[in-house]
Amino acid sequence: MVSTKFLNKLKNEYNIEFNNEKLLEEAFTHSSYSNEHPDDGIRDYEKLEFLGDAVLELAVSNYLYRHYPKLNEGELTRLRSNIVRTEGFSEFAIECGFQKEIHLGNGEEKAGARNRKTLLEDVFEAFNGALFLDQGMPAVERFLHLTVYPLIAKGEFDDSRDYKTDLQELLQQNGPVNIEYSVISESQLPSHFVVELKINDQVQTQGEGHNKKAAEQQAAKAALQKFE
């Protein structure tokens, strides 16, 4: 069973209460657990993952179409790909408290599967598949408005410009320059990184993001605005 603490988190932070809690249990059940505990009668999350993958792609596509009217089809596709890749959804799974609720078989638990990014991505997709079946697309959209969409709006998935490369090329026009990125703050719940950018050992800017890469890009972007 999922914990009471987690159910309260869903209710208080995301305003989610499942009508059919068996769907929620299924969303967090790995095949290794269901194989080891057949008498529990809980299916694994693979079919919900299949559904959730399609639900999330549709929801994100709809959001991008409505909020980024100036992007062409190729740019929208690239941005959507950045959002739905493994690393992004795995971090959301951790932030939402899914990681601790996953039911794993003994072998997978010992192998560290609970920290495996691909598994966490699967669980995030399965949860959204379960939420879709339980309450429909509007509930999924409300959940994403509290989790995924704010980071899209902040530009954390936009790689249309590589600020780090642009900064390096700008600064090295007149010779070698030492550019250093250092993580000065990191938290997991929610995932949040602060990176400090030094140029020739002098602190220039800081950047924040949901992962190290995003924070580095934000620090480089701030430096470009400073030097351009």
From Swiss-Prot:
Low complexity: compositionally biased ranges: 216-228
Subcellular location: Cytoplasm
InterPro entries associated with the record: dsRBD_dom, RNase_III, RNase_III_dom, RNase_III_sf
Presence of keyword rRNA processing: yes
Chain residues that bind Mg(2+): E49, D122, E125
The keyword Metal-binding is annotated on this UniProt entry: yes
Cited NCBIfam families: RNaseIII (TIGR02191)
Function: Digests double-stranded RNA. Involved in the processing of primary rRNA transcript to yield the immediate precursors to the large and small rRNAs (23S and 16S). Processes some mRNAs, and tRNAs when they are encoded in the rRNA operon. Processes pre-crRNA and tracrRNA of type II CRISPR loci if present in the organism.
Protein's name in the database: Ribonuclease 3
Organism: Lactobacillus acidophilus (strain ATCC 700396 / NCK56 / N2 / NCFM)
